[in-house]
Swiss-Prot record:
Taxonomic lineage: Eukaryota, Metazoa, Chordata, Craniata, Vertebrata
A GO biological-process term: receptor recycling
Region spans: G1 motif: 65-72
Gene symbol of the encoding locus: Ehd3
Amino-acid positions noted as binding ATP in the UniProt annotation, renumbered to this chain: G65, Q66, Y67, S68, T69, G70, K71, T72, K220, W258
Source organism per UniProt: Rattus norvegicus
Chain segments carrying region G4 motif: 219-222
Protein name: EH domain-containing protein 3
Length: 535
């Protein structure tokens, strides 16, 4: 008797088993989170319902910046080819949102056709109306970079009233819609004319719930000298500190992302290193895409729960017959108190609550009599999903990550930075002398030999203790010197001959110049007398 109670309880505790992360996210959303969203009209307040394409699409990169900061040129630099609809110039050229995506043939799909395509993740943009859809296109082209990621180019942010009035649609709301769905948001600034307008500040604030996705690029940095660049960088960090309210510092990449010669080449090495870091960040997106989607679903579930508590609290406070309008105004004005009460009753973090002013504005237009009371079962299902099913999916996420290559984005600008003499760091540090016929250490060997013969060699070798006395003079930590010893002691006899000692000193010099040590000794650094032994 009542055995079905036990079965239901057991079913609730056992998390579902999924084949892929994408399939699991889709099923969890449709069966567990969507019913809660629909019951409390979540989509009217926050974000449209998710579709299959939102879970299946490639990682997307959103570029945001004021006009003429180099957004379109940046995409052209990554792809190493023009894309349909591309316009570049010092004036505000890009007047549309352009989704640059992989396609078999070059072409443009207009916005109205794009939002009815179930395979594209843009169907819910339909809500922004014709004024926006006439300014939204998809540029398709065959390109190796676009096989792994898609890029969203945005119109330059204007100053003054034009930004809000002449566009005909809510620009900040559209950006927020994209920000929820993309994997990386890149804010571009022009180092030559650094200016953060009030409109740009508002846009950055609209993206404030997505700081984890944000990266900053200080572009066109080759147009100013080192001293000016330091001042511009400091000014940018100060300005961002006032707009982005996070204790962590947003990562800023400095460079010149176009294929023209550097105007002031003083900081070439810095630009190359920064470009490599940015490319590595973009290349990691396909590998981390499943984790990002899982993270976004958890974020959405937490907001949906808070929204349910807010709506049900408002419903509970409303009178059944008289004085509804007066009570509605009173509740909207006292929303901060309702937030505080929900926070205390349900132990919810203040960061999970929606923006107070925005919520008040939205509630003004709502009919409170249509709100639903608290339905515990819907919330329990979401709690169960967060506690059990998400943990199961995390295991699957890790499995999928290990099966994927570390750097999945290939082609375009990503290809030229990997190999050959123009690869990053080629011929520098431990790579110095890689193409030379002569052993690179031989240049300084006479100087190292003088030191070697003062360390009392026996049968042409010095002991580890004597070598240590000399090596610690470099003031490098023991962990680094230990690694250098392992690399230099090629025959592993615990002693160093003159060539091995010279090699150890060469590696110390490499480290002192700020380069990383190799994990294994490169072939060109092997002393000539040891090359046959190593083979």
């Amino acid at each position: 008797m009542f055995s079905w109670l036990g079965n239901d309880d057991r079913r609730k505790k056992d998390p579902e088993v999924f084949q892929t992360v994408s399939e699991g996210l889709k099923k969890l959303y449709k069966t567990k989170l969507l019913p809660l969203e629909e019951y409390y009209r979540f989509h009217e307040f926050h974000s449209p319902a998710l579709e299959d394409a939102d879970f299946d699409n490639k990682p997307m990169v959103l570029l945001v910046g004021q006009y003429s900061t180099g957004k379109t040129t940046f995409i052209r630099y990554l792809l190493e080819q023009d894309f349909p609809g591309m316009r570049i110039g010092p004036e505000p050229t890009t007047d549309s949102f352009i989704a640059v995506m992989q396609g078999d043939v070059e072409g443009i799909i207009p916005g109205n056709a794009l939002v009815v395509d179930p395979k594209k993740p843009f169907r819910k943009l339909n809500a922004f109306g014709n004024a926006f859809l006439n300014r939204f296109v998809c540029a398709q082209l065959p390109n190796a970079v676009l096989e792994s990621i898609s890029v969203i180019d945005t119109p330059g942010i204007l100053s003054g009233e034009k930004q809000r009035i002449s566009r005909g649609y809510d620009f900040a709301a559209v950006l927020e819609w994209f920000a929820e769905r993309v994997d990386r948001i890149i804010l571009l600034f022009d180092a030559h004319k650094l200016d953060i307008s009030d409109e740009f500040s508002e846009v950055i604030k609209a993206l404030k719930n997505h700081e984890d996705k944000m990266r900053v690029v200080l572009n066109k940095a080759d147009q100013i000298e080192t001293q000016q660049l330091m001042r511009v960088y400091g000014a940018l960090m100060w300005s961002l500190g006032k707009i982005v309210n996070t204790p962590e510092v947003i990562r800023v990449y400095i460079g010149s992302f176009w294929s023209h010669p550097l105007l002031i080449p003083d900081n070439r090495k810095l630009f190359e290193a920064e470009e490599q870091d940015l490319f590595k960040d973009i290349q990691s997106l396909p590998r981390n895409a499943a984790l990002r989607k899982l993270n976004d679903l958890i974020k959405r579930a937490r907001l949906a729960k808070v929204h349910a508590y807010i709506i049900s609290s408002l419903k509970k406070e409303m009178p059944s017959v008289f004085g509804k309008d007066t009570k509605k105004k009173e509740l909207v004005n006292n929303l901060a108190e309702i937030y505080g009460r929900i926070e205390r009753e349900h132990q919810i973090s203040p960061g999970d609550f929606p923006n107070l002013k925005r919520m008040q504005d939205q509630l003004q237009a709502q009919d409170f009599s249509k709100f639903q009371p608290l339905k515990s079962k819907l919330l329990e299902v979401v709690d169960d999903m967060l506690a059990h099913d998400i943990a199961q999916l995390m295991v699957l996420v890790r499995q999928e990550e290990t099966q994927r290559p570390v750097q999945m984005v290939k082609g375009g600008a990503f290809e030229g930075t990997l190999q050959g003499p123009f690869g990053h760091g080629y011929g520098e540090g431990a790579g110095e002398g890689i193409d030379d016929a002569e052993w690179v250490v031989a240049r300084d060997k006479p100087m190292y030999d003088e030191i070697f013969y003062t360390l009392s060699p026996v049968d042409g070798k010095i002991t580890g203790a004597n070598a240590k006395k000399e090596m610690v003079r470099s003031k490098l930590p023991n962990s680094v010197l230990g690694k250098i010893w392992k690399l230099a002691d090629i025959d592993k006899d615990g002693m160093l001959d003159d060539e091995e000692f010279a090699l150890a000193n060469h590696l110390i010099k490499v480290k002192l110049e700020g380069h990383e040590l190799p994990s294994e000794l490169p072939a060109h650094l092997l002393p000539p007398s040891k090359r046959k032994v190593a083979e």
